[in-house]
Swiss-Prot record:
Protein's recorded name: Chaperone protein HtpG
NADP among keywords: no
Quaternary state and interactors: Homodimer.
Region (C): 559-638
Name of the gene this protein is made from: htpG
Originating organism: Anaplasma marginale (strain St. Maries)
Nucleotide-binding found in the keyword field: yes
Main location: cytoplasm
Region (Disordered): 484-508
InterPro entries cross-referenced by the UniProt entry: HATPase_C_sf, Heat_shock_protein_90_CS, HSP90_C, Hsp90_fam, Hsp90_N, Ribosomal_Su5_D2-typ_SF
Region annotation (B) ranges: 329-558
Length: 638
């Protein structure tokens, strides 16, 4: 060794080194990722420069990265045969934080962006992550076209030395790390393999590990299939890659592969699974799309490159323009991530919409697996256009559904009756109970279709989404007489008028009795109801519950109470079908005999029945049973 020169790091480097070692990175594994990325950059540079200067390397020579360990000396070495660095470049690039050679190289060639020249070290701090695990760092390098090599050495204490390497040296760079005593496990073969396959599996150059017997073992696949043209990727390649990143044994239901070359460049290779992943409804709602920068894995945990309501997606997003902060773990420009996220979201929704139109049978399987997750997006803050894009791919059961048929909101609107102003819907626990609900009887009997919502998330989005394509949503629990009057089957204006006149006459004859009985019911039920009225939407059922126009939907209110987010019970309206034989009998009983214990019990039974139908708890199950028993005993006593 000769010509040793000791130098100090540039100003404030001591503080920055401390930041890098103690604060910037949360995962020590990334030091090896950073060193390998630098080696890959060096190979990229040489490959690019070789196009104009073929004396820099032998034609056909393999550019490679080699990892070796010396357990006795606690040394981990990473060597590449890339472009290498001169003495001045060692000082400039390794002696100054945030002044990386890669950034300088890009600036020199910014006049013509080279195809295939992928350089990720855009900030000069990645290298310094080695001091998290090493007490001493040596970098030996010989630049392509030169015959003299140089050695850079530092313990991360604010100074470094540079010297000339005596004797013959080969082109490239060798990084030698003397590991701390408590970081010995980074010399373990399996630990190295895990880090390489996790972060650098798709680096475009082979990464070898020299085994204990001196043989070389290739660690990375070196293939990033998302960088290939989509028509050159076989179905078997897709299946193999999907299974490797998703840990799902089945084949993907759909592949979404695009290369975006607009303002921000990125590639997305996304898969929709054909089965529901086990962690789909994990409380963390984790997304499983991996973020890469030029084929180097960055994260899948702390950056949301897809919205959470698309967390069923598996795959990768790889960007060459993605800005990085000083650390590759913390992305610098959230706005760029948001742009990628918005673009990917649009592409996914477009692909789903096309699939729903072209293959509705297959799409039903997708919807049954992931529809509830996708509808979570409707609850998020977004503009109307984005929300309607989600609604356009949503599918629903309806009162007209046959054998589980699903419809779109577009289908519903196209079938609306003349004069219909709302998309009517009903929330229920399941399809069967919703189809049999008294709430929709009047709508169905008048030919009005009702959307049936049976997922828990439906109660949330219907409270924030007010309309679709200009048509407002309305719960059938808020439907009143005016919503049904104009849809009576077979009515024209004249017959409607005549029927109304006859109805008024009939009502006048029994109005006093009906109003008196309703007043009596209000007295019996007290604060349990806010109102009792004659229903127009009931045709076969006896009673149902309704809510005022602007009140919470019954199912939503119940959920909030269960979650302790609501301490009160909202007002209920009890609706009566006075054409029902039971009500007719009660009206006669009240008219003939007035108030009685039997009538009082029956009034409570009617209200409890309405609560049970809506899934509400009765005030007292014991009282309900006792009243029913008294009514039955009275019946059989006769």
């Amino acid at each position: 060794m000769g010509d040793v020169e000791e130098l100090k790091f540039s100003a404030e480097v001591g503080k920055v080194l401390s930041l890098v070692v103690h604060s910037l990175y949360t995962n020590k594994d990334i030091f090896l990722r950073e060193v390998i990325s630098n080696a890959s950059d060096a190979c990229d540079k040489l490959r690019y420069l070789f196009c104009s200067d073929q004396s820099l390397m032998e034609a056909g020579e393999e550019l490679r990265i080699v990892i070796s360990v010396d357990r006795d000396r606690r040394e981990l070495t990473v060597r590449d045969n890339g472009i290498g660095m001169s003495r001045k470049e060692l000082i400039d690039n390794l002696g100054t934080i945030a002044s990386s050679g890669t950034q300088r190289f890009l600036e020199e060639f910014k006049g013509g962006k080279a195809q295939g020249c992928d350089l990720i070290g855009k900030f000069g701090v990645g290298f310094y992550s080695v001091f998290m695990v090493a007490t001493d760092v040596v970098v030996e390098s010989c630049k392509a076209g030169e015959k003299v090599g140089h050695r850079w050495q530092s313990s991360g204490d604010g100074v470094f030395s540079v010297s000339t390497i005596e004797g013959d040296v080969s082109r490239g760079t060798k990084v030698i790390l003397t590991l701390r005593e408590d970081e010995f496990d980074f010399l373990d073969k399996f630990r190295i393999e895990h880090i390489v396959t996790t972060y650098s599996d798709h680096v475009g150059y082979p990464i070898y590990l020299i085994a204990s017997d001196g043989t070389e073992e290739k660690l990375n696949s070196g293939v990033a299939i998302w960088t290939k043209p989509k028509d050159e990727i076989s179905e078997s390649e897709h299946m193999e890659f999907f299974r490797s990143i998703s840990h799902i044994g089945s084949n993907p239901w759909m592949v979404i592969h695009n290369k975006n070359e607009g303002t921000i460049e990125y590639i997305n290779l996304l898969y929709v699974p054909s089965v529901k992943p086990f962690d789909l409804f994990h409380p963390d709602r984790r997304c499983s799309v991996k973020l890469y920068v030029n084929r180097v894995f960055i994260t899948e945990d702390n950056v949301q490159v897809i919205p959470q309501y698309m967390r069923f997606l598996r795959g990768v997003i790889d960007s060459s323009d993605l800005p990085l902060n000083i650390s590759r773990e913390t992305l610098q420009n959230n706005m760029v991530i948001e742009k990628i996220k918005a673009s990917v979201t649009r592409r996914v929704l477009t692909s789903l919409r096309e699939k729903a139109d072209s293959d509705p049978v297959s799409y039903k399987t997708f919807w049954e697996n992931f529809g509830p997750v996708l509808k979570e997006g409707l609850c998020e803050a977004m503009d109307t256009e984005s929300r309607e894009s989600i609604l356009s791919v949503c599918r629903f059961y309806s009162s007209n559904s046959k054998e589980g048929e699903l419809i779109s909101l577009g289908d519903y609107i196209s079938r609306m009756k003349p004069g219909q102003e709302h998309i009517f819907y009903l929330s229920g626990n399941d399809l069967e109970s919703a189809m049999r609900s008294p709430q929709i009887e009047g709508m169905v009997s008048n030919g009005i279709e009702v959307v049936l919502l049976v997922d828990p998330v439906d109660d949330f989005w219907t409270s924030v989404v007010l309309e679709y394509k200009g048509v407002p949503f309305k719960s059938v629990t808020r439907v009143d007489e005016s919503d049904l009057e104009k849809f009576t089957e077979g009515d024209d204006q004249q017959s409607t008028k005549k029927k109304k006149e006859k109805k008024d006459t009939d009502d006048a004859q029994q109005k006093e009795n009906v109003e008196a009985f309703i007043d009596y019911m209000k007295k019996v039920l007290g604060d349990s109801v806010s109102d009792i009225k004659v229903s127009r939407k009931l045709t076969t059922s006896l009673v149902c519950l309704a809510v005022p126009e602007h009140a919470l939907d019954i199912r939503m209110e119940r959920f909030l109470r269960e979650q302790k987010q609501l301490s009160y019970k909202g007002s209920r309206i009890l609706e009566l079908n006075i054409k029902h034989p039971v009500l007719s009998g009660l009206l006669r009983e009240y008219k003939d005999n007035g108030e009685s214990e039997l009538l009082e019990n029956m009034v409570h039974v009617l209200f409890d029945q309405a609560c049970i139908i809506e899934g509400e708890e009765v005030n007292s199950a014991v009282d309900f049973a006792n009243r029913m028993n008294q009514v039955l005993a009275r019946l059989f006593k006769k």
